[in-house]
Amino acid sequence: MKTQRDSPSLGRWSLVLLLLGLVMPLAIVAQVLSYQEAVLRAIDGINQRSSDANLYRLLDLDPRPTMDGDPDTPKPVSFTVKETVCPRTTQQSPEDCDFKKDGLVKRCVGTVILNQARDSFDISCDKDNRRFALPGNFFRKAREKIGKEFKRIVQRIKDFLQHLVPRTEA
């Protein structure tokens, strides 16, 4: 008489259940996005909703705030995006696009959820009014200031020397 223990199908089912038990936790872990991945997904959403002609790409991501471990809790985010040369209608990833020279820069704040299954974000972006100092402008302004200061010093030396020259009375 054959017992269930001798059945080859029971061994296979046991193996399948064991493998499923090992794979399921990996699938759950894979559904949690990193902070940066969640922000990049939010930028994809911003690009889809945008009425602007070109795509935006992440320019600067503020440091990740300390957060709890629950991926379903909204996490605060703040970052800056800049306009790229790629049209919004392209199928290209924004990360593959170059920034547009003098492209529009936007400051974005809001919340994201790290649970990939929920894929939720609430972000608002406004034109960034902060001035980004370009190296060329910095050096030009520094050169102008040094030039003005140099002229002022030369004039003071000339004035000093003129006062040293003995005056002759006519």
UniProtKB/Swiss-Prot annotation:
GO molecular function annotation: lipopolysaccharide binding
Superkingdom field: Eukaryota
Location within or outside the cell: Secreted; Vesicle
Keywords recorded for this protein, A-Z: Antibiotic, Antimicrobial, Cleavage on pair of basic residues, Disulfide bond, Immunity, Innate immunity, Secreted, Signal
Note on domains (UniProt): The cathelin-like domain (CLD), which is the propeptide part, does not seem to exhibit auto-inhibitory function, as it does not inhibit the antibacterial activity of antibacterial peptide LL-37.
Cited function: Antimicrobial protein that is an integral component of the innate immune system. Binds to bacterial lipopolysaccharides (LPS). Acts via neutrophil N-formyl peptide receptors to enhance the release of CXCL2. Postsecretory processing generates multiple cathelicidin antimicrobial peptides with various lengths which act as a topical antimicrobial defense in sweat on skin. The unprocessed precursor form, cathelicidin antimicrobial peptide, inhibits the growth of Gram-negative E.coli and E.aerogenes with efficiencies comparable to that of the mature peptide LL-37 (in vitro).
GO CC annotations, alphabetized: extracellular space; vesicle
An example Gene Ontology biological process: defense response to Gram-negative bacterium
Family: Belongs to the cathelicidin family.
Disulfide bonds: 86-97, 108-125
Record gene name: CAMP
Prodomain positions: 31-131
Region of interest called Active core, as start-end residue ranges on this chain: 150-162
UniProt protein name: Cathelicidin antimicrobial peptide
Pfam families registered for this protein in UniProt: CAP18_C, Cathelicidins
InterPro entries according to UniProt: Cathelicidin-like (IPR001894), Cathelicidin_CS (IPR018216), Cathlecidin_C (IPR022746), Cystatin_sf (IPR046350)
Keyword Secreted: yes
Modifications made to the protein after synthesis: Proteolytically cleaved by proteinase PRTN3 into antibacterial peptide LL-37. Proteolytically cleaved by cathepsin CTSG and neutrophil elastase ELANE. After secretion onto the skin surface, the CAMP gene product is processed by a serine protease-dependent mechanism into multiple novel antimicrobial peptides distinct from and shorter than cathelicidin LL-37. These peptides show enhanced antimicrobial action, acquiring the ability to kill skin pathogens such as S.aureus, E.coli and C.albicans. These peptides have lost the ability to stimulate CXCL8/IL8 release from keratinocytes. The peptides act synergistically, killing bacteria at lower concentrations when present together, and maintain activity at increased salt condition.
Signal peptide bounds: 1-30
